A protein has these predicted regions:
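N-terminal, positively charged/glycine-rich alpha-helical extensions of SAM-dependent methyltransferases
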Residues: 1-34
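Conserved alpha-helix/loop element of class I SAM-dependent methyltransferases that forms part
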Residues: 42-61
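Conserved class I S-adenosyl-L-methionine
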Residues: 63-71
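Glycine-rich SAM-binding Motif I of class I
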Residues: 72-77
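Class I SAM-dependent methyltransferase SAM/SAH-binding core
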Residues: 78, 82-110
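Conserved SAM-binding strand-loop segment of SAM-dependent methyltransferases
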Residues: 108-118
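Short conserved loop adjoining the S-adenosyl-L-methionine
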Residues: 120-126
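S-adenosyl-L-methionine-dependent methyltransferase catalytic module, highlighting the catalytic core
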Residues: 129, 133-134, 142-270, 280
């Protein structure tokens, strides 16, 4: 859906991009202004879009989209360009939410930007969406399985799921219908067995990295959330659709965290801000990158 589009000059866009600080998503805006040159730790979301684009309908007319951890809104914009009726972008950090609102305004799209923790959104919303974008967020979550389960329940047609992984080789692993303590420990310890690695300390200098799955864990995680894998265009990326749950079952229902939480309801951390010292470092990296 289009909003009333403000006329932005190239100079005005360049100035506002600069004012909004460091950008994680580097892409081109109208008039040709780019938000950055793609130097790490930022990235070019267009490379990921090329992988999922073949699995996105050419027309999303009448469809709704949820973009979780949407950052500056690149993927929301791509969905709106295809005619999505409604797009909701959930982003916990104030800085990136402001960038997303600016990007939506520059493009003239009505993107609903919700500045909220994704755990909170998933545990409290009763909405469902036709398409769910869950890219580059899973490993930043303290409770990723809860969020994946809820997003699977919220998906009507298709989910795009990406996670950083340890070892991109998708290897076969020994399986059992039921693993026995002791005698099957060697199978569970096999490097190819699906695993989630917990990070107590920093990973890549980022305090928001908590869990990293192995490549072999992505598909079992998706299946156990009640979805089927329809494509895997990259070791880190899965396209999934709703299915009957294939994982563990409790009381004839999928094992999933209740959406309204326990013991008085979910905790709402509210909007968050990037650590000031980290933000200064990122800005310094941006400035140094621009000199090259």
């Amino acid at each position: 859906m289009f909003s009333r589009k403000k006329s932005w000059t190239r100079d005005a866009i360049e100035r506002r991009v600069r004012e909004l600080g460091w950008w994680y998503q580097h892409f081109e805006l109208p008039t040709g202004v780019v938000t950055g040159n793609g130097q790490s730790p930022a990235y070019l979301p267009e490379t990921r879009w090329r992988l999922i684009e073949p699995y996105v309908p050419a027309s999303l007319a009448g469809k709704t989209v949820l973009d979780t951890g949407g950052n500056a809104g690149y993927f929301s914009v791509q969905m709106m360009k295809r005619g999505a009726k409604r797009c909701v972008l959930v982003e916990p950090f104030v800085e990136f939410s402001e960038q997303a609102r600016f990007v939506a305004e520059v493009y003239g799209f009505q993107i609903e930007v919700i500045n909220e923790d994704v755990h909170t959104f998933c545990l409290t919303t009763t909405e469902r969406f036709d398409y769910v974008v869950f890219l580059g967020l899973f490993y930043h979550l303290k409770y990723p399985g809860i969020v994946l389960d809820r997003l699977a329940e919220m998906t009507r047609e298709r989910m795009y799921f990406h996670s950083h992984v340890i070892s991109e080789e998708v290897a076969d692993h020994p399986t059992r219908a039921d693993y026995m303590p002791g005698q099957d420990d060697r199978l569970l310890a096999d490097p190819s067995f699906p695993k989630m690695l917990f990070l107590e300390q920093l990973y890549n200098g980022d305090p928001t990295n908590w869990w990293i799955p192995t490549s072999s864990a992505l598909e079992p995680l998706v299946r156990s959330s009640g979805m089927k894998v329809v494509a895997r265009p990259h070791p880190q990326l899965i396209v999934a659709e709703p299915d009957q749950p294939l994982g563990k079952v409790v009381f004839d229902r999928k094992l999933v965290f209740p959406k309204y939480g326990k013991r008085g309801g979910a905790v709402h951390p509210g909007p968050q801000r990037v650590d000031p010292e980290l933000w200064r470092k990122l800005l310094a990296m941006r400035d140094e990158s621009e000199k090259k």
